[in-house]
Amino acid sequence: MVNYPHKLKAKSSINRPVPGIVNFANRGMSFEKMINESNSYYLSRGLAVIHKKPTPIQIVKVDYPHRSRAKIVEAYFRQASTTDYSGVYKGHYIDFEAKETRQKKSMPMKNFHSHQIEHMEAVLEQKGICFVLLHFSSLRETYLLPASYLIEFYKIDKGGKSMPLTYIQEHGYPIEMQQLPSIPYLEIIEQKLLGGIINE
């Protein structure tokens, strides 16, 4: 069982199906898997080096039901997580979070936490490229929203209200899902945030 720093225990997900997994183009691929696949594609083509950040966990208790098998039964998050992904593209530091919802009209802001917002602000302070990838699974729509607009909306009431899809459409950029890369977000960064054309 994994516990958060404030000692609240997270529900165990061992041997339970993960809810909310969405099929894309009948391939049974989750949003996170599509992002990871896209990052692998960019890396293999020498376009960018972007990886999912590991979550630092402190193991507290391990059971050994068999001599050759160990089972972690209790652990704690060492620190609060920041964002999901980071890396470098053409000398620019890239940092982003990915969120998914089945709602059709808004993105729940409860999915974002104050320490993540503070981290994004710090990245922007250092002139890094920071954003969120927002996926509406019921609509099969994905958007890249610059972190500055997420931060602005979050500060209205500390993330108490959901972000309307209309706000995301007004300030963000739609991403058309495709074969490879599945989520071509680098094209948006290049064309909208850097003003150039990506060379593949």
Curated annotation (Swiss-Prot):
Any Pfam family hit: RecU
Cofactor names: Mg(2+)
Site (Transition state stabilizer): 99
GO biological process: chromosome segregation; DNA recombination; DNA repair
Tagged with keyword Repeat: no
Assigned EC number: 3.1.21.10
One GO MF term: nucleic acid binding
Residues binding Mg(2+): 82, 84, 97, 116
Catalysed conversion reaction: Endonucleolytic cleavage at a junction such as a reciprocal single-stranded crossover between two homologous DNA duplexes (Holliday junction)
Compartments where found: Cytoplasm
Assigned keywords, A-Z: Cytoplasm, DNA damage, DNA recombination, DNA repair, Endonuclease, Hydrolase, Magnesium, Metal-binding, Nuclease
Cofactor note (record): Binds 1 Mg(2+) ion per subunit.
Entries under InterPro entries matching the protein: Resolv_RecU, Restrct_endonuc-II-like, tRNA_endonuc-like_dom_sf
Homology family: Belongs to the RecU family.
HAMAP family according to UniProt: RecU (MF_00130)
Descriptive protein name: Holliday junction resolvase RecU
Gene source species: Streptococcus sanguinis (strain SK36)
High-level lineage: Bacteria, Bacillati, Bacillota, Bacilli, Lactobacillales
Record gene name: recU
